[in-house]
C-alpha cells in the first residue's frame, strides 16, 4: 500500500459521501502500515497498529468504508460480526476462528499473486495440452514421440486458439480431481472439521478423470492446474503467514451488541466472555492455523457499532484501551441523501438508468425529482426507524416499481422522474406513518 492518505481519502470519496473524519482515520492507519515496513527490523517490531473504534448510527457508511478499504488495501482483510461469536465453552464460533479465516484469505491472495506471476508459463503449458488433444503427436511402434513436420500446423492452431476461433469446439481432457472428504461434526467445531478434511485430503492422491468441455472452459481449468504446478506450497504458506502478520486487517462490526448493558446479568455473561476472548487477539497472541502459527501483534483491528442502547464506556475497560482511536460518524442529512443519489461513481440513479437502458427505456432524473426523493427518505427516517442511506433503496424501489414491471413493453420511451412524478408515487405512503412503517 503505497497510496498516500490523501489519495486513499480521494478514492473513498468516489464511493462514500461525507464521514471525512472516519476516512482520514482509516487512511492514516493504512498508510502507517506502509511506513512501518520501511523501518529497520528491530524498531518495526516495537511499533504496534493503533486500532480504531467507529461509532455511528446504522446506514451512515461504517460497513461501506470497510468494504472499500478491503479493495484498496490489497492485503488480507476480513469482516466479521461480533454477534456471531461465543465465549469459549459455549456452542458457537470461537474468536480464534477470525484469525484462521484471515489466514485462509491470505493464502488465497498469495496464491492468486503467484499464479499471476507465472501466468505466461502456465498459459503456454495449458495451450500445449490443448494442442496435444487437437493434434496428437505421432508415435512409433514402441510408443516414442516422433518428430514430424507438424510444427507449423501447431502454430496455426495456437494462433486460432489465442484469437478465440476454437472457443466453442468441444474436446475431451483429463483433469485432476482432488478427493473430497465430508466429515460431520457438532455445531461449533468447524475448525476441527477443516483440519480433519485437510489431513485426509492430503493422504489421498489426486485422481484424474476424463471430461468433455468447450475449449474456452478447458483452457481455464488447465491454466489453474499448470499454475498450481509452478508454485511452491511451502513458500506460499510462509508468504501467507507473513502477509497476515504484517498487513492483515480485521473489521469487527456490531461490537456494541456484545456490551454488557447496565447492571443486567444472565445472557450478558457470554457477551462479556466474547470481549474477554477478543482481548488477547487484539493485544497480540499466537493462533494456530492449518497454515502455521500466526502472531496477531501487528494485525490492524477496526471495530464499529451504532451504540444506540449501549455506550462505548460499556465495553470492558481493557478492550477500550486497545481501541485508542475513536471516530464518530455523523447522521446523514437531506443534502447528504441528494449527494448519495448522484455523486458516487455507481450512484443509485445511475444504476437504475443503466438497468432500464437494457430494456430500451430512457430514464431521466431531474434535480427537483432527486431533491424530492431525498426529502421523502429523510422524512420516513425521522418518522420511523432511522436506517440511514439504506432508506434510499426502499424508497427508490417503491418509486421505480411500475417502470421496472412494465419496462419490457415500453421500449423506446423516455421517462422523466421529476418532483410531480415522485410526489404522485410516494406521497400517500410517506404521509401515512403506518404505511411508511410497513412499506418503506
Curated annotation (Swiss-Prot):
Its main location: cytoplasm. One of its GO terms (molecular function) is peptidase activity. Keywords: ATP-binding, Chaperone, Cytoplasm, Nucleotide-binding. GO terms for cellular component: HslUV protease complex. The keyword ATP-binding applies. ATP binds at residues 17, 59-64, 253, 318, 390. InterPro entries: AAA+_ATPase, ATP-dep_Clp_protease_ClpX, ATPase_AAA_core, Clp_ATPase_C, HslU, P-loop_NTPase. It is found in: Cytoplasm. GO terms for biological process: protein unfolding; proteolysis involved in protein catabolic process. HAMAP family: HslU. ATPase subunit of a proteasome-like degradation complex; this subunit has chaperone activity. The binding of ATP and its subsequent hydrolysis by HslU are essential for unfolding of protein substrates subsequently hydrolyzed by HslV. HslU recognizes the N-terminal part of its protein substrates and unfolds these before they are guided to HslV for hydrolysis. Belongs to the ClpX chaperone family. HslU subfamily. A double ring-shaped homohexamer of HslV is capped on each side by a ring-shaped HslU homohexamer. The assembly of the HslU/HslV complex is dependent on binding of ATP. This is ATP-dependent protease ATPase subunit HslU.
